């Protein structure tokens, strides 16, 4: 309830083709809201999110959704869960620029709703646009923390080389 995880490549790992769109969307609500499988509750979810997601998605089998529609499904499912923290595992893996911008917008939507977003990534540049701080963690815990206002002090010649060093 407190933490949600969005796995790497969530359109392949977090969508269940044997379930319809509404079932995929509401499955995370079942722990938080009783009666989520009742028609009136599902109608309420559709009324609230249909204009944002597009009414057509409720009629399309999930395996035929576009990549963008699948990402919206996953991120909106998490939004409905209302966790305090969302952990995104390599959210930009294999993504082109348009896809990255779309995922940033989806994460900003979570931030706007008051959720904390933790981005686990190998590429630091992937997270800097959203981050308010960078934390380098080693086997013994936190090794270094850099606040947003200090991002400018990070080296551009060899990007963040010091952050990769082991102690």
Could you tell me what each predicted segment is?
Residues 115-120:
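Conserved H-loop
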Residues 100-113:
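Helical segment within the ABC ATPase nucleotide-binding domain
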Residues 141-165:
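Conserved beta-strand-loop-alpha-helix hinge in the C-terminal portion
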Residues 1-33:
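ABC ATPase nucleotide-binding domain signature region
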Residues 127-129:
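A short, surface-exposed alpha-helical micro-motif characterized by mixed small hydrophobic
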Residues 89, 95-96:
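ABC-family nucleotide-binding domains
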Residues 75:
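Hydrophobic anchor residue at the start of the ABC signature
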């Amino acid at each position: 309830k407190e933490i949600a995880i969005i796995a790497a490549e969530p359109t392949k790992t977090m969508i269940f083709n044997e379930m319809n769109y509404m079932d995929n969307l509401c499955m995370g609500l079942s722990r938080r809201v009783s009666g989520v499988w009742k028609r009136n509750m599902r109608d309420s979810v559709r009324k609230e999110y249909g204009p944002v997601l597009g009414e057509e998605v409720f009629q399309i089998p999930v395996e035929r959704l576009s990549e963008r529609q699948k990402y919206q499904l996953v991120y909106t499912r998490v939004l409905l869960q209302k966790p305090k923290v969302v952990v995104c595992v390599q959210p930009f893996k294999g993504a082109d620029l348009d896809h990255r911008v779309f995922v940033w917008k989806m994460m900003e939507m979570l931030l706007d709703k008051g959720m904390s977003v933790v981005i686990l990534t190998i590429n630091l540049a992937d997270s800097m646009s959203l981050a308010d701080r960078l934390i380098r963690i080693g086997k013994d815990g936190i090794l270094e923390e850099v606040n947003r206002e200090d991002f400018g002090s990070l080296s551009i010649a060899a990007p963040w080389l010091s952050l990769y060093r082991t102690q």
